[in-house]
Amino acid sequence: MTAIRYEFIKTCKQTGARLGRVHTPHGSFDTPTFMPVGTLATVKTMSPEELKAMDSGIILSNTYHLWLRPGHEIIREAGGLHKFMNWDRAILTDSGGFQVFSLSDFRRIEEEGVHFRNHLNGDKLFLSPEKAMEIQNALGSDIMMAFDECPPFPATFEYMKKSVERTSRWAERCLKAHERPQDQGLFGIVQGGEFEELRRQSAKDLVSMDFPGYAVGGLSVGEPKDIMNRVLEFTTPLLPDNKPRYLMGVGSPDSLIDGAIRGIDMFDCVLPTRIARNGTCMTSEGRLVVKNAKFARDFGPLDPNCDCYTCKNYSRAYIRHLMKCDETFGIRLTSYHNLHFLLNLMEQVRQAIREDRLGDFREEFFEQYGFNKPNAKNF
């Protein structure tokens, strides 16, 4: 019995998006879904109870950051990440690869792994497929990710080809080193940049290894949205229908809908909590920056069409006041709202798939949110 099982429910006749359910050792969640990011074993400013109140079935934590602080051995001693952070639903941990490539000024890639400097204190560190598995096995997440190379955008075909080949070899080493396949599902990560030939090669390599799920990596790294959509169009059909598909690092509302239309089941991104900290809110009528002076006497909710805790209880004027005074409660309220907005958006996406009208929903949402306007903002 594998730790992770994907249950297919139906396909949207209008778009081909799929409705499903992922079963894990810590419960099930419906897909397509958005996963809030709890980098350091906490979704910034949110309690586990609040995440449950907004119906989050799975969150993401970060292997690299937890390895550095507090250390995976301490989390193992605590009884694993679920106990450590008091979260009894599913957890996905990334492999640490993206952080090694994005945070460290100094890094040297070898066949064995990656040498780099700790971004906190400059110490020399080494992360390999085996080490990434050891850390994630200690954390005890339900879904763990293979250690991959995260190439920059843009990269040459030659560089990307070598990178894909290395990522495939590393994936094989991850499978061998993974010590808890019965209660932790390991996902392979398809790379290859914008090159269809390399995506095909990467998918073929990984599918032959029979992972319980697959991620599409190397997107949302600065490439235009049309390139991301094009890559998804030729990549997701290469992945098995009976396994979950995860698009890493994507969280803007338009990309969530467009990803679901292209067959993606799972998404994660720090976007909702990151922008909340500077007062930027996603609403049914588009982006709203609550710090702006025009909201000083606005006693209506952030979003008149939202029924979240923030919108039911607090006004734009009050939240603006908190943000201007650097009060933590202001960040909690905007973070709660943004997370609720995306989780609720995914429920609307699932309902549209049930009704075979996701294409129509996309048009309506884009029109209302303002994505169809010239110079539309990303979120």
Swiss-Prot record:
Pathway involvement of the protein, from the record: tRNA modification; tRNA-queuosine biosynthesis
One GO term (biological process): tRNA-guanine transglycosylation
Region of interest called RNA binding, as start-end residue ranges on this chain: 249-255, 273-277
Residues given in the record as Zn(2+) binding sites: C306, C308, C311, H337
EC number(s) on file: 2.4.2.29
Protein residues bound to substrate: D94, S95, G96, G97, F98, D148, Q191, G218
Positions of the catalytic residues: D94, D268
Keywords tagged on the record: Glycosyltransferase, Metal-binding, Queuosine biosynthesis, Transferase, tRNA processing, Zinc
InterPro entries from the UniProt entry: ArchSynthase1/Queuine_TRR, TGT, TGT-like_sf, tRNA_ribo_trans-like
Cofactor binding note of this UniProt entry: Binds 1 zinc ion per subunit.
HAMAP family membership: Q_tRNA_Tgt
Protein family according to the UniProt entry: Belongs to the queuine tRNA-ribosyltransferase family.
Protein name (database record): Queuine tRNA-ribosyltransferase
